[in-house]
Amino acid sequence: MAVPKKRTSMSKKRIHKNIWKRKGWRAALKAFALAKSLSTGNSKSFFVRQLNNQTLE
């Protein structure tokens, strides 16, 4: 198993963590934008079948 030779500095550790956090933030932003476009009906990449608004009795 590979073992690092030296300890990772705090600044490098912080940089790696921020990159990891930014990837998650971007994915969440993209998912939110897609959900928003689907809910407003402005989506160009998904075809959503529209259901008739019927009251259940």
Swiss-Prot record:
Record's keyword terms, sorted: Chloroplast, Plastid, Ribonucleoprotein, Ribosomal protein
Keyword Chloroplast in record:
yes
Statement: the UniProt record of this protein carries the keyword Ribosomal protein: yes
| Top-level taxon of origin | Eukaryota
An example of a GO molecular function for this protein is: structural constituent of ribosome
Q: Which GO terms describe its cellular component?
A: chloroplast; large ribosomal subunit
Q: What is its main location?
A: plastid
GO biological process entries? translation
UniProt subcellular location: Plastid, Chloroplast
Report the family membership. Answer: Belongs to the bacterial ribosomal protein bL32 family.
Annotated protein name in UniProt: Large ribosomal subunit protein bL32c
